[in-house]
């Protein structure tokens, strides 16, 4: 019985209008980047862009110098060390085992030269050794490139985390990366190869956009380098985990995010991916490579109608913003302008998370019942909420609260956040719904009023104070 | 010179991809693939063949349903779990039943004491069903029940319990798995032989089509084939071929295709190979539409494949369980990018025991993060157009189609399963995969690479099943006292009569029995008296494991050790591989059997569902050196000590007992204390286990 | 290795129907160690007076024909009438790895569960075909343990099927309900030794086909020359449980007939003679194999260089062996 598959015979191609007719709502979507996207892209003009050929990446562990051996045993293929204090490098640095990346406030020429010495002392060729000695700001591009001449070391870091931690959107990060690159290239002697440059990029969990952003960066970087007539057209990417949504009081849940971030970093084409000191995070990389088979295909997103569209959209928007920065004279001159833009984005983002408009699982919704006494992650937008929850724990007092009237989802969230229980019988606090918000009263008749939708951490803080004064 | 960027546009280039072929069979020929020649590139979502999704707007209008499968030993505990899960964001209920229920036994049946309440909830009567759904409005909550063997009494209890709480059948939403063909193929929780089983399936499809328009009467499952070792194209082909068989069954009864086909749903497993798994789901939709089209449906929905997915349990490791969070995340991502309609994500300790509240929470959060924080719910089929995904979709579609044609040439799935072909194919793949893992060719983190030095500190959920047993027994005797026994007997007699003739819908008849408070065991036994209980017979495969292992050092050592043993004692080492209790998953046992035979052992395979007495008798009759018990479902804690006692009683404590499978660390002392000599957890290299066993035997020979 | 109690206890145990002792006795017999073989002979000696008491039946046929299913139904039928039966089945060992998989009990689960039944699967081991003195001796032990009849189940390919007729009173050959092409495929030889033929799986769609198949086999049997009577061809279905009692009745009438005409005893006597010769051959062979021969390598070279024939080389080797025995 041979029945051929013959798809087109049974199902003719579908026109755009056929699908459109089935849709009654506007399903387009916007993100904080301000770009409008469709839910759905189809085969159109050829948008096959294959942007990079490298398909595997170097697994990197960020460690203290005492943890070198365990990290290597756990399969780290490169090591990253933070040098924030003046340090003498030990002769036991494993320069023969893997690339080493040094970065931090105290990286200086001493460190650079002692590294080269160690390399030589182990009988290795310093011109072959891979790694980074990333000099801190302020940097003289000419100087760091000269010192590195003849080696393969990366000495100049373009750190997108700087913008990311200030609250930048993806478009802003892209634009700043372009602008920084342009500033650097402008300062270099013409014809100098920028092969000691690398980018350090924080990867978030909006997978499709993160993949697109990495590809968008490659397009723009290539354009800029070509415009400066540089001999190379691409730069290495070091991907690190974004800490913006780090839920310190829910580490296991956060591992889900970390996994998604690494996936985006791999598919988007990072050359190195850095895990923190946690062994689990290293294992995630091993699993994604060996079991998930990610990294076999280079630029797997090639041709994906959605991701190519996102790539182009982010690239165009980033480029347009970059052009604006250039017209203001470059990044150094336009710094305060772009930083105020970024601050607006930050405020918008922070507000939506702290009010509960945007859900962060384990951070402002679906909270864990019990948690360890962890330190909130400073760079996380969840930190204020984590602090409040820790405060509940430190006073060791989970009180009861009763609500008169409707308990809205926002109020429910607030109560959860404070670790309070709803119980009519032994309530210390009564919350009453008013026409424009709520009033909370304790049994000493002290009261506060707050609005619906206010930042949860602030309101929680006031509520906690109210409760604490009941206790005394 | 600083260029004037205001006049410089972005420079783009479009080049052909250079895809590295190493490591994945399916990607090997990608280089020569001409994307433009694909037939399916202009299909869309919501229109046949539904490549990009069964609905036009997919997640953009409504995200997939988070549906976590759970069963706690008693109906009360399960109910409590459902209520808290609903409060924590879950939108659908999924019920897991215990093995005695699956096989049609009441909890107080003599054969099942080790298995009651393990791996799922014990349902003996409609009263248990009432408790299960206490405070849950069945008119508002979608309920998915994984039941195949004892599907008649369970459906009957469900429908009548709903009616008694004021919800009519027309209002009920959800799914019953009711996929008996795959039971015969891989899962072994059938009760009756194939023909009467298919009749029951048909009766349920018909009854639901006529009375429960919002309920899916069958969930054609590929998950279990996936877990048994079937690669993607095979899982696709055999699942869809099963579905086709059910469609034909319904059509043969005179049902119109459009009256039931839109309610057929599917259930796939999601493994770790990210791009292949996501493409598999797309291929499934194309293939199903293609299979249904010849029935000339007027309603296009009849061709739309709707699916539930579950992340693969097989891919999880008991070692270093925290690693499983990443695995489940990747698999969930795959399912979501593949546009599944509902999803179950495994908890990180799912390989060890029933998930605890903490680990269930993380499992659920995986989906919640995907819904809330990734923007994936905005996009319809985001990977569409990707060179590698479209290549894989194309290849899997064609590959699966050829498997389907092969089944058709045998005469359809019922005949094919009777011939043993699909099961044999799957077993071969499983043996190959095991050999690859044992050799280290296929890397599993924590098992054959990057092993953790410390043991895991996970609090496991233990089921003290003696208490469950006692409670269920009490409840049963109370039920039997308070009901009208003559009416029950009447209903059961009526059931028997209708079973032996072909003139009534058995679900109709079972409803009456359920109302009168007949138990699950009584209903099943009534049918068994007419249909008989089925015992499957399967030819084991040989030579596949050893062929794949080739000249691996470990294998060679094991083989020479068994030769040495044969020379020394005059017999080859002889091992009985037995399955105790009601657990029907035999992939592991069968892989071990074929591997051991290839390593020079004489291997006796025991039938499924054996009691400790059965196993002991077999071991003694065959005079084996070792008895290997395979345990996946927790019954080992009671049944293995029983076995050891019987050996003692019969004077054969010289027969060594080893245990393999999912054994939590906490149980090791108990087992060793009862006399077990070795315990092999998942991830044990088979050739190493063989060496250990023979060395122990050799030791014993020199120092008896 | 089991802690085998002494031979006396074993013998006693077997005679008192102790399943464990019978099992260990069979293990002794199957063992390749010469010390075990000696012990096995001692054991047999002790039990000789209690043997020759059962009907011995072989059930043979190609893989997939349904031997186990039929044996299960037949066995259950027999136990219902109060018989205690033993089933010895032989599964092929891999020539490469030496191992084997024996899944017979999975195919006869109800029978395996029955109190009055003893089922022992055995690997064929190194012996070609596997049915040798070991099977014969195991059968004798089962008889001493009071089982009657004894059923030997073998795969009907290779020399095993020839071997089995030297050990049993009747050979039941099972065939599938396809006539025509399959018939050509069945080896001439196996048809020659069958005493009774049963078509299996005659259920459902196959019912009509089996009638036709039965007739074809009957016809083929009619062309045999060296049998006094032409065996019957029966139609059975394990699934429907049909034809099973007819099989047993046919066997019983064959037995009555053969006893009446003296063929039964003749056959057994011939078998004993054959068995003695076979055992002698086997001793000779193991003795021969146990030594090393200088001439082997020389002769091998000569034949390779076309300086001698294989036959001449064999003669030379035999001479060397005979010399070494002096």
What is each PLM-predicted segment?
Chain B
Residues 259-260, 298-310, 318-351, 355-380, ...:
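Flexible glycine/proline-rich, aromatic-decorated loop/lid segments
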Residues 589-699:
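Cofactor-cradling patches in redox/metallo enzymes
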Residues 64, 303-307, 571-574, 650-659:
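Short beta-strand/loop segments at the ligand-binding rim of alpha/beta enzyme cores
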Residues 61, 89, 125, 166, ...:
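Conserved, mostly hydrophobic/aromatic
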Residues 154-156, 229-237, 271-283, 311-325, ...:
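Short glycine/threonine-rich loop-to-helix capping motif typified by GTGT followed
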Residues 1-271, 295-298, 303-308, 336, ...:
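Catalytic alpha/beta active-site cores
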Residues 114-118, 182-192, 225-229, 268-273, ...:
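Short beta-alpha connecting loops at secondary-structure transitions
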Residues 6-38, 44, 48, 99, ...:
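Flexible, glycine-rich loop/tail regions that form catalytic "lids" or insertion modules at the edges
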